[in-house]
Amino acid sequence: MEVPVDSKYQGVSALIRYASILLNYKNSKNLAAYGEKVVSLSNSLNFFAYPLNIINSNNSPEIFKAVKHNFKEKNAEKNVLSLNQADSHFIDSIGVSEIDKNKQLILEAYEHFYNNGNFDKLNRGCYRFLKRIKGVNEYDINDAVIRYMVSTICLRDFSQCYNIIESISQEYTLFDYNIILFFLYLVEGNYKEASTKLLKIKNNIPEEFFEYVKEEDLAFYFAFCLLYNFNNKDYKEVLSNNEIFVYKLYDKYQKFFGIVDMYYKCDYLNVNNEFNTKLKERINKDPFLCGNSDSIEKNFKEKILKEIMSFTNEISFKTIAELLVVNKNKATDMIVNLIESNKLDAVIDDINEIVIMKTPDDMNELLKKSNKTIQKNLDDLIKFSYGNIKHKISHQIEGKGVVRKKLDRGEYDMRMYMMEGGPD
C-alpha cells in the first residue's frame, strides 16, 4: 500500500494522518514493510529530529537522553520546568492551586513532549492535567485537549479518553468538544458512536482541530458516518441543526454528501455505484479507515440488502446483485450469511433463485382487513419516493399485496404512513 503524501501536511499533522498505516504494518508483524514505510515517510516529510522513532521515541533510552539534554540546553535560561518535573508524576504531587500557578510552564513542557514525539508522557500528562484542572480559561486548556487527542491516536489507547473529554465538554462550553469525541470514535473504529457524536456537533469547533484534520477530510468522515449508520430522522436533524455542516460543508462537498442524498432517496443502485467507484478507493487510502475497509464494505452492502428486503416479500438473486452492484454469487453468499446469522428472517428458493421474506402473522391479519387501502397507499408511496428502483423490483411485488415496512426513506415507516395519511 502506498503511503499518500500531501505537501500541505507538515510536522505532527502528517504523523497523525499517517501513523495508523505504519501501526497497521507493525501490528501485522510485517516488520520489513513497517520499517520501509517509516523510512519512506520520514524521508518524505522530515517532521521530527529523530524520524526513525516517530511512533515510540520514549522507548529508546538513547533518544530520550538526547531529547532531555537538548531540552535542558534550549530552556536553561527560561526557568521552564525540567523534563522530569513536567512528567505526569509532577502533576500527581501538587495541588490544584499549584497546577493553576504553573499551568503555562506545564503546557510548555508538554509542547516539548509533543514536538519530540514523546506521546506516552504527553498522553499521561495531559490526562492528569485535564482531570485535575478546574475553572481555568477555556482558551488555555484547548491546546491540552487537542494534544491529548493527538497522543491518544498515536498510542492507540482509547481506554480513558472518552470520560475525560465528556467531562471537559460539560464543564467548558465555549468550544464544541463533541468534534474531538467524534474523531476519536472514528479512529478507534466505533462508527456507530461516531455517528451519535456527529449529531451533537453544532459549531465553535476549536481552530486547533483543523491543524490536524483538513476540512475536506472532515466532510468525508461526516458523509462516511452518515452512510454507515444511516437514519433518515438523524439526517434531517443534521441538516436542520448542525451549523458547521449546513453552512460550511454540505454545499461545498457535494461529491460526498450527494451520495448521502442518494441514500436518502432510496437510489440504491447509484449509491452502490458511487461507493464502488469513489468511496471504496478513498476508504482504502484513508489511514484511519483502511484497516477496516473490507468490513466497512460488507456491512454497508448488507445494510442496504436488508432495507431492500423490507420492501418486498420476495426478490430474485439477480435483482439483488444488480442493485448492490455485485455478481450473483456474491449476492447469494450475502443472503445466506444474513439468514444464518439471524439478521434476515427469510428463506431461499434455490430452484427459482429467489429469497422469500417471512411475513409476521399480525401483518397478514392487517393485510386481510385493509388490503385495498394499503395497496393504494403503497402504490402512491412508490410513485412518491421509490421511482429510482421500482423498475428493478416491480415485477417481484405486483399482485403480492405485501405490507412493506419502509418504502419512504424520507420520513415514514408503514405504520406512520397509515396513521398520518402519507408523506407531506
Regions found by a protein language model. Name each.
Residues 1-424:
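Charged, E/D/K/R/S-rich low-complexity terminal regions of large eukaryotic assembly subunits
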